[in-house]
């Protein structure tokens, strides 16, 4: 679809140069032949790692292959006048101490917290005096109960207990996010000193156990059972269950009936922003503004960040130790350590010389589950969507539900399961699960006056299509048209409001952002690929078989979701190792 219509006659405008960009014109921006540490990839985790290392006095350089930093946490004006969070689009899971330590607000980070945060309209006939029903959830528990009681009074009474139950589990899991997993290798094969040091890695696990106490078996079930089972035990109304279940399958090639889907839900409710547990926000200026703030913090301390500098190979010396990188243009940069924010597959199967990696390790990396159900569609529109269940106010000003994650085709968990079954057969879902967000409802800087940016996070779309088909432009547009038809049923007039769109299928997400298989987490967040086993068993502490080479991206513990924890944790592991060299 060609760009056109109101607001699109504006030429691409240049925003003020971020602090980190200005820093590159200074002394610390010139490429040097040697650094203490080199970071491959300027995704948010790589930037966090660089910022922490630089704070600790480790001279660090970051090399990014694209023209823009942030990895998947990026803002791009791909349609003139419209700024899109092109891949990741919401913030919640970023560790609070990262915001504090790196002084991100000082470096320009501004958040728009959403309250209410979830809106699920029903696809049903209204009457003269009654609109189609909808489920609107926010931080006001009394208001939530009133909304839920439309569907079940019993569920309205049970909902506060469910929220408290999940909150306690989040508090227990929280300490596990901020440290490397238990060092089982040291316990098994380390020296006495190494074993004593490894005892400290048990503390987060012990703390989690104490927090859960006698309820540990119930919480174990939440982590291992299908989310449908967990929700069926507590609720009876499908709109509530399906709305909650979306957090258990988002970004995952799983159904609500898949064992272990409960953990993915937990992963998406464990965030905390500005002291509010479970809060989700839009970032002023898009997700790239978060990456700019982290980069600014790192650059202010002296880190060097380079764009359009692709790392072609990790250099390994004759003793099997990483000693720098070779760039695509042939330039060599030496360093004492190398951190990779790239996925495990790119890091170990493409960049690291294979002769230095054990065959069993390479095999495990190549077998990681990276299935992705996600197609992201970024849309420029010339008016707000007008939902039948919540008609727009006069003047077309954003209302509370417009700032929410708007869940479409999510009235019943059976709809989610059927959408999953379509994709398992190699077909895009006939009724895809759609999470529609309108960040410009809270941040008008993202679009021309009167216009809006719409983010459509949709699933399920398989990476490989049945019948030998490929994701060409025709297939992509056919699927996008299907998504738009679904939205039109809830919000008539949506299709007429569309000015332009950007369609990113799993192969596109892999090609542009190097997300393996298009997986937004760098690999499935299933129980067999978490904690001790992320990315693979025996190598969950950010180290790998090549000494001096570390993994610091979402493929490492604790996983994806614009959390920053992997970058922060890896930086501390690297710093300890540097002190012992």
From Swiss-Prot:
Pfam families: Amino_oxidase (PF01593)
Organism name: Mus musculus
Binding site for FAD: 38-71
Origin superkingdom: Eukaryota
Primary enzyme class: oxidoreductase
MF terms (GO), sorted A to Z: oxidoreductase activity
Biological processes per GO annotation: mitochondrion organization
Family: Belongs to the carotenoid/retinoid oxidoreductase family.
GO cellular component, one term: mitochondrial matrix
Quaternary context: Interacts with COX5B; this interaction may contribute to localize PYROXD2 to the inner face of the inner mitochondrial membrane.
Annotated localization: Mitochondrion matrix
Keywords: FAD, Flavoprotein, Mitochondrion, Oxidoreductase
Annotated protein name in UniProt: Pyridine nucleotide-disulfide oxidoreductase domain-containing protein 2
């Amino acid at each position: 679809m060609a760009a056109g219509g109101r607001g699109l006659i504006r030429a691409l405008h240049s925003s003020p140069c971020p602090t980190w960009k200005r820093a590159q014109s200074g002394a610390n921006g010139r490429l040097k032949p040697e650094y203490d540490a080199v970071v491959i990839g300027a995704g948010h985790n790589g930037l966090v790692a660089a910022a922490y290392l630089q704070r600790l006095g480790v001279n660090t350089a970051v090399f990014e292959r694209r023209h823009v930093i942030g990895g998947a946490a990026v803002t791009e004006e791909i349609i003139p006048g419209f700024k899109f969070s092109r891949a990741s689009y919401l913030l919640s899971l970023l560790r609070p101490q990262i915001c504090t330590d790196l002084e991100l607000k000082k470096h320009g980070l501004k958040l728009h917290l959403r309250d209410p945060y979830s809106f699920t309209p029903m696809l049903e006939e209204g009457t003269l005096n009654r609109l189609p029903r909808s489920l609107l959830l926010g931080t006001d528990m009394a208001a939530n109960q009133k909304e839920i009681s439309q569907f079940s009074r019993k569920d309205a009474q049970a909902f506060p207990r469910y929220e408290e139950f999940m909150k306690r589990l989040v508090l227990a899991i929280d300490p596990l996010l901020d440290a490397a997993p238990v060092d089982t290798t040291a316990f098994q094969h380390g020296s006495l000193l190494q074993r004593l040091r490894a005892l400290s890695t048990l503390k987060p696990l012990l703390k989690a156990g104490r927090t859960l106490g006698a309820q540990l078996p119930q919480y174990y079930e939440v982590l291992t059972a299908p989310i449908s089972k967990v929700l069926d035990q507590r609720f009876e109304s499908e709109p509530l269950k399906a709305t909650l279940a979306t957090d258990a399958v988002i970004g995952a090639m799983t159904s609500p009936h898949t064992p272990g889907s409960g953990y993915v839900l937990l992963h998406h409710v464990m965030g905390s922003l500005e002291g509010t547990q479970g809060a989700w926000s839009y970032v002023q200026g898009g997700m790239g503004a978060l990456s700019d703030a982290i980069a600014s913090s790192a650059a202010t301390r002296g880190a060097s960040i380079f764009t359009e500098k692709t790392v072609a190979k990790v250099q390994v010396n004759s003793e099997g130790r990483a000693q720098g990188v070779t760039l695509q243009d042939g330039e060599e940069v030496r360093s004492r350590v190398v951190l990779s924010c790239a996925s495990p597959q790119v890091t170990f199967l493409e960049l690291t010389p294979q002769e230095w990696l054990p065959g069993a390790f390479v095999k495990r990396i190549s077998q990681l589950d990276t299935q992705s159900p996600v197609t992201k569609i970024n849309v420029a529109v010339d008016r707000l969507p007008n939902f039948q269940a919540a008609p727009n106010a006069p003047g077309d000003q954003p209302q509370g539900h417009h700032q929410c994650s708007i869940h479409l085709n999510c009235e019943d968990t059976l709809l989610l399961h059927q959408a999953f079954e379509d994709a398992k057969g190699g077909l895009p879902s006939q009724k895809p699960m759609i999470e529609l967000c309108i960040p410009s409802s809270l941040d008008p800087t993202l679009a021309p006056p009167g216009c809006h940016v719409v983010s459509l996070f949709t699933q399920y779309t398989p990476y490989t299509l049945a019948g030998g088909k490929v994701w060409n432009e025709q297939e992509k547009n056919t699927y996008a048209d299907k998504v738009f038809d679904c939205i039109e049923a809830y919000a008539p007039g949506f299709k007429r409001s569309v000015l332009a769109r950007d369609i990113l299928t799993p192969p596109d997400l892999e090609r542009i952002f190097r997300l393996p298989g298009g997986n937004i987490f760098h690999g499935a967040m299933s129980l067999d690929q978490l904690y001790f086993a992320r990315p693979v068993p025996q190598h969950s502490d950010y180290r790998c078989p090549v000494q001096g080479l570390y993994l610091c991206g979402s493929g490492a513990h604790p996983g994806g979701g614009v959390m920053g924890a992997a970058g922060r944790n890896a930086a501390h592991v690297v710093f300890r190792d540097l002190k012992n060299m």
